[in-house]
């Protein structure tokens, strides 16, 4: 890498005197290509809740750093992941999500594959000299169910998710005891014109909550709000109050808790006040200035109550657009001649509810991949 793309090993190591990345790290295609290979091709990436693949033949597809991935539960109930391309000539095999047939058929030349990825039939292969059926299967990648969610990893030498996020599953289950019962209730898909790190930076602080999220801020008790850092994950937690602008809570519950987890590299798990539902922000970087996001909302019941429907609409029409407008504006502003190139990370000694020390922790981790 060129000198402009390197960062010192101790970058943001001291959050009390920290500045953000130089702006090139948010805009450069060279930086993005490096991060794509050094970070995303070698990390566990969360792609969905386990309930989306609850039954045999269930499958989903995801696009991660330009790779089309299919995750499928076989007839044997085993979870598997593959690159979603035919080994013959590269045509994509499955689209969207749903229930697969007992074989996967390529739309191009009708090669068929069993749900374990092995080749079932290649038309005319008996008449093709030295055709290698064993080497014509779908190409697998690692997949793991962890903490009630599905993770994939393109690194064939990767160890388990727990090694990447030690202690996270236990803490998440403490925050939300109904994870295994959750079901997808809503998904907002956006191709956001912002670098993936801009989006994480925004999540890693509540300094902006008062000015930019008035409804959310009306429910959050900022004087009872903490942000703790762990190994490759952080936790923002505290106590809430009922608000007509956002969360309408049971008045008999004193100081209901909320939890917001960021996990390396860029998935955010939220347990709102009440602890009986979750929202998850899945980030799938596309290029230096574009990130595909799935904002998923999960409840335990399939037939939604009116309050739940109203809450979904609040997320859709109020809370979600507030964050999208913020990160899109930042991405534009970073390229201005009026931006001095780095911003001061506003960490206070008390590590209060509005302190930005979470950003410093995240940026220090990223810096280790830019030596």
Swiss-Prot record:
Q: In which pathway does it act?
A: Amine and polyamine metabolism; carnitine metabolism
Q: Which domain of life is it from?
A: Bacteria
InterPro entries with a match to the protein in the record: Carnitine_monoox_A (IPR039004), Rieske_2Fe-2S (IPR017941), Rieske_2Fe-2S_sf (IPR036922), Ring-hydroxy_dOase_2Fe2S_BS (IPR015881), Ring_hydroxy_dOase_asu_C_dom (IPR015879), Rng_hydr_dOase-A (IPR001663)
* EC number(s) on file: 1.14.13.239
Which keywords has UniProt assigned to this entry? 2Fe-2S, Iron, Iron-sulfur, Metal-binding, NAD, NADP, Oxidoreductase
Pfam families listed in its UniProt record: Rieske, Ring_hydroxyl_A
What's any GO biological process attached to this entry? carnitine metabolic process
- Copy out the cofactor comment: Binds 1 [2Fe-2S] cluster per subunit. Binds 1 Fe cation per subunit.
The residue ranges of the Rieske domain are 44-152
What effect does gene inactivation have here? Mutant cannot grow on carnitine as a sole carbon and energy source, whereas the growth on succinate is not affected. Mutation abolishes trimethylamine formation from carnitine.
Amino-acid positions noted as binding Fe cation in the UniProt annotation, renumbered to this chain: 208, 213, 323
Role of this protein: Converts carnitine to trimethylamine and malic semialdehyde.
Identification of the protein by name: Carnitine monooxygenase oxygenase subunit
- Specify the species: Acinetobacter baumannii (strain ATCC 19606 / DSM 30007 / JCM 6841 / CCUG 19606 / CIP 70.34 / NBRC 109757 / NCIMB 12457 / NCTC 12156 / 81)
